[in-house]
């Protein structure tokens, strides 16, 4: 026997097919000309290919084990086993380098559709408590005329005569390794294996048409501006009647004339006169839950905040609600009649806050003096 193919692959004579294949893969990675251009390595690569061609084929292996020449029965020659009988191992070469054999067969016309997105505007109270919205969407749907097939009624897709339904065409080229077969998608059917001679007049062969429809969307309480709600299977229908993608509803919360939202809390400002701030009062306020009275305690200062617990936005996850924070702004009068000014001076005098003439103390101002400076814009 001229060549010991078992020794070439480095396996025992009783090695299993799995062991033979693993040995070939390992050597192919090491000795492939693209990895190692040494001429001696190229010869070695041809040897392992010839050995694998024989030992991976049960019939050829049996002839070889009995002392015959299995390659003489292959009907061809070619360098290194890449002759007419050697194409069966080309996928194993590809598998050794890319981890999988080259894909065969036509690709499917049926594919998943694209996702779609639409923006929906809601009011603040709808975001706080949740709501439902009817929305108009326009997406691709299955053509009812051809049921998504793309062919005109009474006709059907035909097997491509160029690739004979394989979806790819092959050609043989010669290299230093011998003959090599390469494949590419069929240019006539774009790799599908079928052609549509008479396209559907409704969808022009696409299998889909655009359609407007109404969907009801449930918007949960607590959604924030920019939140996206996923509606599975409500997006674009895929080519060839494939499954539809998803529809994403993006929430856009409109500004409110009274409240500003910060997370799940709401903020607003109430304005009261200085007398109300000094004496205390109750201020009516329209909240999301209806009319309520905000208790302003005596001595409240401008800029002070009063929380109304549980009057904010519903928590999206978990129970409860945020707070409504009321910010107090105290105003002082800009104009007073003589009687009002007299009374205010009297109050300042009673409180010891009126500044006596000729007794100025740096850094100290009474109530009336501070108010007067405010009136004059100082």
Swiss-Prot record:
Residues 358-367 have a biased composition (Polar residues). The keyword rRNA-binding does not apply. InterPro entries: DnaJ, DnaJ_C, DnaJ_domain, DnaJ_domain_CS, HSP40/DnaJ_pept-bd, HSP_DnaJ_Cys-rich_dom, HSP_DnaJ_Cys-rich_dom_sf, J_dom_sf. Keywords: Chaperone, Cytoplasm, DNA replication, Metal-binding, Repeat, Stress response, Zinc, Zinc-finger. Its cofactor is Zn(2+). Gene3D superfamilies: DnaJ domain, Heat shock protein DnaJ, cysteine-rich domain, Urease metallochaperone UreE, N-terminal domain. CXXCXGXG motif repeats lie at residues 143-150, 160-167, 186-193, 200-207. This is Chaperone protein DnaJ 2. It comes from Streptomyces avermitilis (strain ATCC 31267 / DSM 46492 / JCM 5070 / NBRC 14893 / NCIMB 12804 / NRRL 8165 / MA-4680).
